Amino acid sequence: MGDLSCWTKVPGFTLTGELQYLKQVDDILRYGVRKRDRTGIGTLSLFGMQARYNLRNEFPLLTTKRVFWRAVVEELLWFIRGSTDSKELAAKDIHIWDIYGSSKFLNRNGFHKRHTGDLGPIYGFQWRHFGAEYKDCQSNYLQQGIDQLQTVIDTIKTNPESRRMIISSWNPKDIPLMVLPPCHTLCQFYVANGELSCQVYQRSGDMGLGVPFNIAGYALLTYIVAHVTGLKTGDLIHTMGDAHIYLNHIDALKVQLARSPKPFPCLKIIRNVTDINDFKWDDFQLDGYNPHPPLKMEMAL
């Protein structure tokens, strides 16, 4: 993990930057509790972990392995659109949700009448239409339910001191209709000194595959919301409940731990976008991303 003395310390946090993630992985490997899980693979698990990532002059896209940046962007824009159709991502050559929208997975989980690609009322639906009755991924839900994302944006603009700027993906009524319950369940925004910060609570964190993606995804959401509200970016605080390593990811993560992190890249939004619904892939410029090679880890199903 390199020389820790070269990293700036933050009050309450021993390490900063990517070393926080690497330390979490190392702690789970050393002290994690062996647990069974729904996939049958098994995990090493610790409960309650937190890291703080500085978003002011850098973007927390891990460098000790290559993270699929375009997928991070396209998935977030898909959430923002309120979409729950995995075929929309597949059409952009993003296949991270394909297996969950497959007829085999849907049938195995009791969704026999679902069209292929229909994931149920997952993240995007909850962000934009919380409380609306979910029919299918093709229905028009315009002005149905609560648009939590737009409500947060409006509140940041009109009442930035508010402590109620929250987006929740955890809707107990809708969970039986989802292909998977949300792993990252809630985020809260905070404005101070002209900066926007975000804290995300993740009930379940797959350290090998999901967590690097989730860190980048919520960092990007913070950049986007800051852009449309005229603020600078502050911090991303990433809090996890069950932080775990699948047993079949251990070898790859040991390779990752042996690598020294490189400087995080910088992110620029290169077009003046005022409506959060108008962002597209070409609006984001990532500079200085020079990661170590990718590491293959199988998705646990």
Curated annotation (Swiss-Prot):
Keyword Heme in annotation: no
Active-site residues annotated for this sequence:
C183 (nucleophile)
Q: Give the matching Pfam families.
A: Thymidylat_synt
Keyword 4Fe-4S recorded: no
* Keywords noted in UniProt: Methyltransferase, Nucleotide biosynthesis, Transferase
The pathway where this protein functions is: Pyrimidine metabolism; dTTP biosynthesis
Entry binding sites for (6R)-5,10-methylene-5,6,7,8-tetrahydrofolate = D206, A300
E.C. numbers: 2.1.1.45
> What reactions does this protein catalyze?
dUMP + (6R)-5,10-methylene-5,6,7,8-tetrahydrofolate = 7,8-dihydrofolate + dTMP
Give binding positions for dUMP: R38, R163, R164, R203, S204, G205, D206, N214, H244, I245, Y246
Q: Give one GO term, molecular function aspect.
A: thymidylate synthase activity
Question: GO annotations under biological process?
Answer: dTMP biosynthetic process; dTTP biosynthetic process; methylation
Spell out the subunit comment: Homodimer.
Q: Which family does the similarity line name?
A: Belongs to the thymidylate synthase family.
What is its biological role?
Answer: Catalyzes the reductive methylation of deoxyuridylate to thymidylate.
Q: What is this protein called?
A: Thymidylate synthase
| Species, as recorded | Varicella-zoster virus (strain Oka vaccine) (HHV-3)
